[in-house]
């Protein structure tokens, strides 16, 4: 079996918002990499046995901060690539000088490559469009580094050590705005570090299955299946590895999208022949939420009841030794960053449930090395449907946070129908994958309408569709008026409890994507 971790890159994080992008670009080239805080122990860096090290950007100023790259980085003899802050600290630690720029530079810029024979710029033209994001600049490279690229506002846009495989770029090759950024990453990782491209879906599947078999043996495994991307892919890889040793528990809260519970059962229980226990808990959730209007209270009630029901059912499964979870690599990074990183974490992720306290289960996380895009590709490789893997994000509390105020059975059914029409038309008009997220929101207010000669006094549905790269910011989707008119007409005509449809044109910020 191929050792997919044999050649790897170590990324030291100085707090850049783009650090995870660096890792994703390295992996897209076909090489495994991991992110660790910049102040990780020197012994750890030495024992990690990386083929190369990347120093990320960061929000600090090098000359005002004691945050530097560990000296061990430059003593190991492996290639080093410094990006933005990473370049600045590397140059300064080798006798160069960094000062505040007269003018900050954020956005696209043209750099001129002065030395095309340098390996970091192999297979590239002299002029390159790149993405800058910095307030400081290198003013003196010192005796060890030479300038290999420059721009109008950044005379030192890239550097190379005269004798060692150390390189620095002031711009961000990891962003898509840098036209040939992936080529720069590939040049460093493959050509300079000499990494073999072993990190691919076929090898990952083979490696994961072998690891799961070795770890689990003949033990039984429990998985909380939600129908979301992560738990679905965990179910598929575990089923392929250990077959009927896996039992999935699917808690149907009644707050899912229209027919979603049946679809989950169809894919996993019928088509894939996975042992899935479906718990119809709709009434328990409605009872628990009766009279509750506060969004945060609703979230807590839904989360706690989900865990309670899962625990009840899991306790009935005899001889189970493992609890599988859909933890992915970005969760691992965010969890670590809460304690160690300089990055400002906007939202942390918590898998629903965690380990039930009274159950002596070991944790199994087959996806913890993978980013979301890799999880989706893994799912395709395991035979899961494309539409399941590339669906829009759905909140953990489900429709509970898309029904404003109190949740009632009538409200849930009304929203499910309206939301399904919106989604169906997005697919029909090939717009679904043009937006990042789209859904309906139930407003518990009534509005007068007229259908035929009949006066109607029914509820209002708000449609929400946004375009976003990272969901930290978003713009409202400029969907065609004819399309919105069609969706509105269908909802008002087919969902009897709705008399009016509105479209949300609020960005994030100032609004959030979800209404609650």
Curated annotation (Swiss-Prot):
Keywords: ATP-binding, Glutamine amidotransferase, GMP biosynthesis, Ligase, Nucleotide-binding, Purine biosynthesis. The active site is at residues 84, 172, 174. Residues 8-198 form the Glutamine amidotransferase type-1 domain. HAMAP family: GMP_synthase. Pathway: Purine metabolism; GMP biosynthesis; GMP from XMP (L-Gln route): step 1/1. SUPFAM superfamilies: Adenine nucleotide alpha hydrolases-like (SSF52402), Class I glutamine amidotransferase-like (SSF52317), GMP synthetase C-terminal dimerisation domain (SSF54810). The keyword Ligase applies. Catalyzes the synthesis of GMP from XMP. It catalyses: XMP + L-glutamine + ATP + H2O = GMP + L-glutamate + AMP + diphosphate + 2 H(+). PANTHER family: GMP SYNTHASE [GLUTAMINE-HYDROLYZING], GMP SYNTHASE-RELATED. This is GMP synthase [glutamine-hydrolyzing]. Residues 199-391 form the GMPS ATP-PPase domain. GO terms for cellular component: cytosol. It comes from the Bacteria. The keyword Coiled coil does not apply. InterPro entries: Class_I_gatase-like, GATASE, GMP_synth_C, GMP_synth_GATase, GMP_synthase, GMPS_ATP_PPase_dom, NAD/GMP_synthase, Rossmann-like_a/b/a_fold. Homodimer. It is an enzyme of class 6 (ligase). One of its GO terms (molecular function) is ATP binding. Its EC number is 6.3.5.2. The gene is guaA. ATP binds at residues 226-232.
């Amino acid at each position: 079996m191929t050792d997919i971790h044999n050649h790897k890159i170590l990324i030291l994080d100085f707090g850049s918002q783009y650090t995870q992008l660096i890792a994703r670009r390295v992996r897209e080239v076909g090489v495994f990499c991991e992110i660790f805080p910049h102040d990780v122990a020197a012994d750890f860096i030495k024992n990690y046995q990386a083929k190369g090290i990347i120093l990320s950007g960061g929000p600090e100023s090098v000359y005002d901060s004691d945050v530097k790259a560990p000296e061990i980085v430059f003593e190991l003899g492996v290639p080093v690539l410094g990006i933005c802050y990473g370049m600045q600290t590397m140059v300064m630690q080798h006798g160069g000088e960094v000062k505040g720029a007269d003018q900050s530079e954020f956005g696209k810029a043209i750099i001129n490559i002065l030395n095309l024979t340098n390996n970091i710029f192999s297979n590239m033209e002299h002029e390159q469009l790149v993405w800058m994001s910095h307030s400081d600049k290198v003013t003196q490279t010192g005796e060890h580094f030479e300038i290999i690229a420059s721009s109008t506002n950044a005379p030192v846009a890239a550097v190379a050590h005269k004798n060692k495989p150390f390189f620095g770029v002031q711009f961000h090759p990891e962003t898509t705005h840098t036209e040939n950024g992936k080529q720069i990453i590939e040049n460093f990782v493959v050509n300079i570090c000499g990494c073999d491209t072993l990190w691919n879906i076929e090898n990952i599947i083979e490696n994961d299955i072998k690891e799961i078999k070795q770890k689990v043996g003949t033990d039984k495994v429990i998985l909380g299946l939600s129908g979301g991307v992560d738990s679905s892919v965990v179910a598929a890889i575990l089923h392929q590895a250990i077959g009927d040793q896996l039992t999935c528990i699917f808690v149907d809260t009644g707050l899912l999208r229209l027919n979603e519970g049946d679809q989950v059962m169809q894919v996993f229980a019928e088509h894939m022949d996975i042992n899935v226990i479906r718990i119809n808990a709709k009434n328990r959730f409605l009872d628990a939420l009766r009279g509750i209007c506060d969004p945060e209270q609703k979230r807590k009630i839904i989360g706690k009841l989900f865990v309670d029901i899962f625990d009840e059912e899991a306790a009935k499964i005899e001889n189970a030794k493992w609890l599988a979870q859909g933890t992915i690599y970005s969760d691992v990074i965010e969890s670590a960053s809460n304690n160690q990183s300089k990055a400002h974490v906007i939202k942390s992720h918590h898998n629903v449930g965690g380990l039930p306290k009274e159950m002596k289960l070991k944790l199994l996380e087959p996806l913890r090395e993978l980013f979301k895009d890799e999880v989706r590709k893994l799912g395709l490789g395991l035979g899961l449907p494309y539409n399941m893997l590339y669906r829009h994000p759905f909140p953990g509390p489900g429709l509970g946070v898309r029904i404003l105020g109190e949740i009632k059975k009538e409200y849930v059914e009304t929203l499910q129908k309206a939301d399904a029409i919106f989604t169906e038309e997005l697919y029909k008009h090939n717009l679904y994958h043009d937006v990042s997220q789209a859904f309906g929101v139930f407003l518990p207010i009534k509005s007068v309408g007229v259908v035929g000669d009949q006066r109607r006094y029914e509820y209002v549905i708000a449609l929400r569709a946004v375009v976003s790269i990272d969901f930290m910011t978003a713009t409202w989707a400029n969907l065609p008026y004819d399309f919105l008119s069609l969706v509105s007409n269908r909802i008002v005509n087919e969902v009897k409890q709705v008399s009016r449809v509105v479209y949300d044109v609020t960005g994030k910020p100032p609004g959030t994507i979800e209404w609650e």
